[in-house]
Design a protein with these regions (language model features):
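The substrate-binding groove and active-site-proximal loops of carbohydrate-active enzymes
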Residues: 43-45, 81-95, 133-145, 168-177, ...
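Substrate-binding cleft and catalytic face of glycoside hydrolase catalytic domains
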Residues: 64-80, 95-175, 323
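Boundary/entry segment of secreted carbohydrate-active catalytic domains
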Residues: 25-60
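Glycoside hydrolase catalytic-domain groove-lining segments
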Residues: 92-95, 99-101, 107-108, 115, ...
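Active-site neighborhood of glycoside hydrolase catalytic domains
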Residues: 177-199
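Short, acidic/polar
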Residues: 46-59, 143-156, 202-212, 296-305
C-alpha cells in the first residue's frame, strides 16, 4: 500500500514537471498544427481590410500558411537609413493590420510567416540585391538601421505568436560582403523572438553563396528559376528543366542539414511564363500573349518535380489577394473584376491592359494548387 502511494506521488510529480516544461520551454505549444507535413503557403497581399471569407478561401484551397509583407523605405540603394513605414502603408501592412490578419488566420488553423521587405524610392533601376554602401562607416550605419527595423518586427512576431520570421529578402551584395554582420543581426533577433527563422535568397547566384544558413532554421529561396527558352512549353520539358535546379538545391540542403522553403515561387498566365518567371506583369509588352494553360502546366511541373522531395519544407505561392466582396463562384468574381478594370481604364483614358496575373486565384492554376495542397 505504501509502495503504491509512493509510486502515485512520483507519477503526479513527473506529470507536473513535464507540464511545466511544455509551458515554460515552448510557449508555442498551443498553436494549430498543419494538416500536411509541408508548408502549404501563400504570399498574402495586404489591403485596406480583411473579411472572414478571405480566410475561408485560403482554407478551401488547402493552404496552411500565409506570409505577410510590411515594408521599410530606403531613399536610393546607397542610403544607409531605413524608415519604418508603419503609418504610411496599406492597413494590412501596418502593425495593427498584420496582427489582426494573423489572428484571423490562426482562428482557421492558418499559420503566418512575417516577411518584411525593403522598398527603394528613387531606385534608378536598382533593387534590393544592388544595395551597397560607399564606406565602412555607412555599412555600419546601414546594418544598425536594418537591425533596429527588423527587431521591430521580431518583437511584433514574438508578442503575437507569429510562427515564423523571414529576416531579409534578396540582399545579394550585403550577404556576400558582410556575412558576419548578418550573423550578428540573427543573434539579436534570437534574443527577442523564439519562432523559426529563415532568409529569402535570390535564385540567381545568391542562395548558393549565403554562408549563414547554419544560423537559421530553414534555407529560404526566392525560386523564380528560368526553366525553358521557348513559349508554351510542354510539361515534360518543364519537369526535365527542374532537374539541374533540384540537384543544386538538394546539395545545399545536405551541406547545411537544413530543409528548404521557397519563400516565393510563382508564374504569370502568359505563354512565356517559364522563360523569365521573375518579370513583373507591368514590365511586359502589352501584346504579350496570355496563356492560362501555360501557367497551369508550370504549377503542375513544379509540384510533380519537387513536392515529394524530402529536403523541401514547402512553398509560398506568389501571390494571393483579399477581395472586398463574397462571390458564389470564381466566374462571377472574374466578370465583376473585368467590369471594374474597364471602368478604371475608361476613367484614365487609357486602353485596358491585358489580364496578366501572377496570382493563380484568377486562373485554372488554382485547381492545381488545391489538388496538391489538399493531398495528404
Amino acid at each position: 500500500m505504501v509502495s503504491f502511494r509512493i509510486c502515485s506521488v512520483a507519477i503526479v510529480i513527473i506529470s507536473i514537471v513535464i507540464m511545466s516544461f511544455d509551458i515554460v520551454g515552448d510557449k508555442y505549444t498551443d498553436r494549430v498544427e498543419s494538416k500536411t507535413p509541408k508548408m502549404n503557403g501563400l504570399c498574402w497581399v495586404a489591403g485596406d481590410s480583411i473579411a472572414e471569407h478571405n480566410i475561408d478561401d485560403i482554407v478551401d484551397l488547402g493552404a496552411t500558411w500565409i506570409s505577410q509583407t510590411p515594408f521599410g523605405l530606403m531613399n536610393g540603394h546607397t542610403d544607409p537609413n531605413i524608415e519604418l513605414m508603419n503609418e504610411r502603408a496599406w492597413w494590412g501592412e501596418t502593425d495593427k493590420g498584420i496582427i489582426y490578419t494573423a489572428r484571423e488566420a490562426k482562428k482557421k488553423g492558418i499559420k503566418t510567416m512575417l516577411k518584411p521587405h525593403i522598398w527603394i524610392r528613387n531606385s534608378k533601376g536598382k533593387w534590393r540585391s544592388d544595395i551597397a554602401m560607399e564606406s565602412n562607416e555607412e555599412w555600419d550605419q546601414w546594418f544598425e538601421s536594418y537591425k533596429k527595423w527588423i527587431l521591430h518586427y521580431a518583437r511584433l512576431a514574438e508578442q503575437n505568436q507569429i510562427e515564423a520570421l523571414c529576416i531579409g529578402t534578396e540582399f545579394d551584395i550585403t550577404t556576400r560582403r558582410h556575412p558576419d554582420k548578418w550573423r550578428t543581426v540573427i543573434a539579436e533577433i534570437r534574443k527577442v523572438y523564439k519562432g523559426d527563422l529563415t532568409y529569402g535568397a535570390n535564385w540567381y547566384r545568391e542562395y548558393e553563396t549565403v554562408s549563414f544558413w547554419d544560423d537559421l532554421d530553414f534555407i529560404g529561396v526566392q525560386a523564380y528559376f528560368p526553366l525553358v527558352k521557348e513559349n508554351v512549353p510542354s510539361k515534360a520539358a518543364l519537369i526535365k528543366s527542374w532537374g539541374k535546379h533540384k540537384r543544386s538545391l538538394k546539395k545545399l540542403s545536405e551541406k547545411y542539414d537544413k530543409k528548404i522553403i521557397f519563400t516565393e515561387i510563382g508564374y504569370k498566365n502568359t505563354e512565356d511564363a517559364a522563360i523569365e518567371p521573375w518579370t513583373w506583369p507591368q514590365n511586359l509588352d502589352g501584346n504579350t500573349p496570355i496563356s492560362d494553360a501555360t501557367q497551369m502546366l508550370c504549377y503542375e511541373a513544379l509540384f510533380e518535380s519537387l513536392w515529394h522531395e524530402s529536403w523541401l519544407e514547402g512553398f509560398f505561392i506568389w501571390k494571393w489577394f483579399h477581395t472586398s466582396y463574397k462571390y458564389e463562384d470564381f466566374d462571377e468574381y472574374h466578370t465583376e473584376r473585368q467590369k471594374r478594370r474597364k471602368e478604371w481604364a475608361k476613367k484614365r483614358g487609357r486602353p485596358m491592359r491585358p489580364s496578366i496575373y501572377f496570382s493563380p486565384q484568377y486562373t485554372d492554376a488554382r485547381e492545381v494548387l488545391k489538388k496538391w495542397y489538399t493531398t495528404e
